[in-house]
Amino acid sequence: MTPHRTPRSRRTVALSAGLATAAAFAFLPGTASATSADVLGAKDAASAVTEAAGTPLSYVVNVRPGKGNSAKVKKAVGRAGGTIVQAYDQIGVIVVHSSNDAFAKTMRGVKGVQSAGATRTAPLPAQSTKDVGTPKALTGAQAEAASAAAVAGEDPLQPLQWDLPAIKADKAHEKTLGSRKVTVAVLDTGVDDTHPDLAPNFDREASVNCVTGKPDTADGAWRPSAEESPHGTHVAGEIAAAKNGVGVTGVAPGVKVSGIKVSTTAGFFYTESVVCGFVWAAEHGVDVTNNSYYTDPWMFNCKDDPDQKALVDAIVRASRYAERKGAVNVAAAGNSNYDLAADSIHDTTSPNDTTPVPRDVDPGECLDAPTQLPGVVTVASTGAKGLKSSFSNYGHGVIDIAAPGGDSTAYQKPAPPATSGLILGPVPGGKWGYMAGTSMASPHVAGVAALIKSTHPKASAQRIKSLLASQADAVPCTDPYDINGDGKVDAVCEGGKNYNGFYGVGIADALDAVTKKK
């Protein structure tokens, strides 16, 4: 069996220095390199895995709309050697396990099936792998200095949070902290709801474990284990860490946050888990979902590949369902410094659950899910100086909005008393640590969306997205963009001040979110 690659699907980047638990991140635009497998085509690599006799895989089968189709397709699943794990009849997606190597091909020939495909190239269950890195832990000296600098009304670590004033969240909090009737769901690696910065605002009823593609509602199933990444806990804190005299403050510290665990222990975000997560959010009153990941094993899912097309079809159905139910879906743009509007991108990481096979893809035809899906708010990252982060993906017509996600202090140094260009947030075990990535930018926008929902409780998801865009602070292109000062252009921005490929409509504005009625 081919060994698993270290999963890189979370939208964080690894740091050279790290402490504490598992997963914080650096400023290297491309982290994966080509392998000896580049003599094969990508499709050949995938089929080489699935054609092994009796390989157990997970699949999604997408049913065509039409009376009676669901029942017929379910019967066909059994005849094709599949076992139904979960049927999401509300969106026509069926999660299946099968050891029949021809299962997907057989199902694609069944009347009433729109698409069907394997959600992974690795056999069930996925092998365990180590995480990418560790958070850069907050030191005792930093905490003491921050606490001494805190003014009345601030949480003790808030002076280190340069990201809050960058979106005017500190000013917004003088008006309101957000509504307890608003919930943001974090689809991620799990959330430690016992953390003192998260416990006051945690919504247990809207939390679940979706890793298998079927909701696990056992108490605490949404939490990460000790071996798993703190990523989801950090993201949740950026959104809604309570303003309670402890630790940090979230963008919307008065709203609720839930944990929807969609990542395996090995760190993979598979389609069945993501579909389950969106459907759960849709049916449990969630107002905003945050998605700081890409769906494994393909960084880009190509429409001309029947398996990859099926994965996109399933996630589109689920995310649109969540939006129809009132949720605004926010997603991280990614950390490869890719131009997502380019004619071609060289993908060296896919499939990431077996042996990657380098390939050239057209990002207009091969989609990063959920980042590039219709209706999703796609977020680019900025650093402490308000410039595009060195790692952040970009692209005219792809990026919707920008927010702080951090960057190396060598590139963008914050003003004192903040000392790190990264984003500070909670990590499991009652600790706090620094992380960076578009993973950190996305929850800032999710938090602002939650503040807008708090101000406009009857607003539809579409209306909230419209306000998010109209209230953003426009930022012109950074031209030339030479973030490391070596005299070479590191990325090219297209567009004008009011919209461009680096910052979209601009940087999210939390103060406008709570003060503007239109």
Language model region names:
Residues 153-254, 276, 283-310, 335-350, ...:
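Active-site core segment of subtilase-fold serine proteases
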Residues 4, 37, 74-158:
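Autoinhibitory propeptides
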Residues 40-51, 78, 130-186, 214-228, ...:
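N-terminal domain-start motif of subtilase-like serine proteases
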Residues 53-63:
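Short glycine-/aliphatic-rich beta-strand segments at the starts of folded cytosolic domains
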Residues 353-451, 508-515:
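Extracellular S/T/G-rich loop segment that most often corresponds to the catalytic His/Ser-adjacent loop
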Residues 262-369, 373, 426-444, 500:
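Substrate-binding/access-modulating region of protease and related hydrolase catalytic domains
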Residues 37-52, 85, 286-293, 456-518:
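C-terminal subdomain of the subtilisin-like protease fold in secreted/lumenal serine endopeptidases
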Residues 1-36:
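Secretory targeting and sorting signals
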